[in-house]
A protein has these predicted regions:
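Catalytic-core segment of enzymes that process non-peptidic bonds
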Residues: 98-135
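Solvent-exposed loop/turn segments connecting transmembrane beta-strands
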Residues: 32, 112-114, 137-141, 269-276
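Active-site metal-binding loops of divalent metal-dependent hydrolases
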Residues: 24-26, 59-60, 167, 211-213, ...
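N-terminal, active-site-proximal structural segment of metallo-dependent hydrolase catalytic domains
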Residues: 1-97, 103-113, 188-191, 284
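His/acidic metal-ligating clusters that form di-metal
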Residues: 146-163, 179-210, 214-215, 219-222
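Beta-strand-turn-beta hairpins that frame and shape the catalytic cleft
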Residues: 7-22, 115-129, 140-168, 282-284
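Metal-dependent phosphoester-hydrolase catalytic domains
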Residues: 1-7, 127, 132, 194-208, ...
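Surface-exposed cleft-lining segments at the edges of enzyme active sites
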Residues: 28, 131-136, 167-183
């Protein structure tokens, strides 16, 4: 699903230091996306109003006839329930927020429900050339999302490329779910894409990779983190606090033009989810 924000939603491309990126696992309808966006815009989360942002969201859901009926020969992930049956899904958010939204499901949300769940990129800015990347399969289908937004630089407008990922917490039954860690391979698949021509050249202001890395085994000691952190040459400071009851699972990484740096900060409110959002700020 791809919905472009109305032209008036963003008054020209922002400079990089005017843009905020946030990564958050919304835990389906439990996450209060509208409340988070309202507080972000008002400045309550940053100390100043935010007019330009990109949200890298995991575990949004969609319900309705667009989701095929379950067939007995199909496989499905378990359903994440319960919740208010009238709660907003991604199509409701798209209709009410007036923002650009790109959503791609990774899996069904249970066999009994006409629902699926996946990642979404939500932004005040027009999204350029969005695409989906199916990650190496371990236990459940996982789809990362890519897109770009336009930012203003001293050399004119350029693209800031973004990648939104939700990695696999467990391996397959063949390895008893825990004796093989699939996340490093999924990060390598993402970094292989980020090494292609799209992400190189003078037209690119930088690349941001964020998401729920599900580093449930060892947090920042896992290879998935180490690979992304080594790639992330512009991360000047990162908030190392836990983002979930199981540890530090959520991250934002960046590789930017020379002279630019990024810092991250975990918010102190979960907005109904079981994950804390992670904010990223850019500066020279």
């Amino acid at each position: 699903m791809f919905v472009e924000a109305p032209a008036a939603a963003s008054a020209g491309a922002p400079s990089l230091d005017e843009l905020v990126v946030l990564s958050w696992n919304a835990h389906l309808a439990e996450g209060e996306l509208r409340d988070l966006i309202g507080k972000l815009k008002s400045g309550e989360l940053t100390g100043r109003p935010v007019n330009h942002f990109v949200l890298l969201v995991q575990e949004l859901y969609r319900r309705g006839d667009a989701v095929p009926e379950f067939d007995v020969h199909d496989r499905s992930a378990f359903a994440i329930v319960p919740r208010d049956p009238e709660s907003f899904d991604v199509e409701d958010h798209a209709a009410s927020l007036g923002l650009s939204i790109f959503y791609v499901p990774s899996m069904r949300n249970g066999p009994e429900l006409r629902e699926d769940r996946g990642n979404a990129i939500v932004s005040t800015e027009p999204l350029i050339e969005p695409f989906a990347l199916e990650l190496p399969l371990a236990r459940q289908r996982r789809v990362a999302l890519g897109a770009a937004v336009r930012v203003q630089t001293a050399d004119g407008p350029k693209r800031l490329e973004l990648m939104d990922a939700h990695l696999e917490p467990l391996s397959s039954p063949k390895t008893l779910w825990v004796f093989k860690n699939p996340r490093a391979g999924q990060v390598r698949a993402i970094l292989d894409v980020l090494d292609t021509d799209r992400y190189d050249g003078d037209a690119v202001a930088g690349v941001v990779l964020g998401g729920d890395f599900n580093t449930v085994r060892a947090g920042a000691r896992e290879d998935a983190y180490r690979l992304a952190r080594k790639w992330s040459t512009s991360l000047a400071h990162e908030d190392r606090r836990d983002t979930h009851m199981m540890g530090r699972l959520d991250y934002v990484f960046a590789k930017l033009e020379d002279g630019w740096k990024m810092k991250t900060r975990r918010l102190d409110e979960r907005f109904g989810s079981d994950h804390y959002p992670v904010l990223a700020f850019f500066s020279r």
